[in-house]
Amino acid sequence: MSKRNRKTRPAKVATTMAGNSTAQAEAFTFDAPIPMMDRRDILDYLECAVMDRWYEPPVSFSGLAKSFRAAVHHSSPIYMKRNVLVSLFEPHRLLSKQDFSRYALDFLVFANSFLEARYNRLGGIIKLVPSPAKYTRRGVEADTYWYVSSYANPHPFEANSIFHLLDPDINQEIYGVPEYLASLNSTWLNEAATLFRRKYYLNGSHAGFILYMNDAAHKQEDIDALRKALKESKGPGNFRNLFMYAPAGKKDGIQVIPLAEVAAKDEFASIKNVTRDDQLAMQRVPPQLMGILPNNTGGFGDVEKAARVFAINELAPLQERLMEINDWVGEEVVRFRPYELLVSAG
């Protein structure tokens, strides 16, 4: 046979048939991945969307209001700053101490604060009234503002009657954006950890278990009764015992397999501490001024020195911002007394 006629036959693919088994590998996840930064980025292109006759803020004011009380270390520094500012504020005939408290709190929470000037018949200002920043919107037309607590019935303010104090943003110039925006993820994580631990205790201090039964001696009625008893043991009053009678059952006929031991494996304390540090770093309030106990033996240091540094670095700039109303009114409406610790140290 010539070499040209010698052809190499292809090898047959060996197949193995194991009966009628059609087992296949399957990969699955318990939940879909959650994107952290995706669709919300398009809002940076929109800046402030026009809604009817006013601009909507770039950040949801309702969301900021809900997040305000989401975590202890988020609201406590804001209240602390507000309380110190109110204690140093000298009341004026146009602006009471209570109205100033609302004016300062809105600026600290929303980075926007609005004061409405009420005029007499001669055109003079008789009172400055704070308008809730959560519902106040800047109008599309110049020097116009709207109070929008309901889209069905918006209220327009008189032209040139609203003073708008804002913390400047890098993406738009219509509304202010809070400085603490970067720490909101830590605030929400802190809240989620607290809510999870609360549900964990309400569930009977366990993460759940699998009740495995392989004993043929049990009847369907017994299984249904056990299932009903387990359902009723969840929630309030969950610390109760269950009785199961199986005279012809096997030793391992009933097994309780715990899913996880949360008390030993979760990172509740670590999450709380890390998120607390993030929030305090963003708010720039010394921990000793908020009543936080130190974890080390050395403590946080001298509280008076920390208070003086806080007054110089944080309170003084806030006071300067809040006093911008004086230039708009043409009168010294907002004025502060000296901080006692700075006077005593001077």
Name each model feature, range by range.
Residues 1-135, 174, 299, 303, ...:
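Flexible, gly/proline-biased loop segments at the beginnings
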Residues 2-14, 18, 153-286, 290-300, ...:
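Extended, charged amphipathic alpha-helical segments
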Residues 24-52, 139-147, 190-212, 245, ...:
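Short, charged N-terminal helix-start/capping segments
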Residues 52-63, 90-93, 145-159, 185-188, ...:
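Short N-terminal helix-initiation segments at or just after the protein's N-terminus
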Residues 95-99, 108-110, 128, 144-147, ...:
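Short amphipathic alpha-helical surface micro-motifs
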Residues 109-111, 121-124, 141-142, 205-206, ...:
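Short, well-ordered loop/turn elements at secondary-structure boundaries
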Residues 116-118, 129, 148, 212, ...:
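Residues in well-ordered beta-strands of folded domains
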Residues 120-176:
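Active-site and NAD+-binding cores of ADP-ribose-processing enzymes
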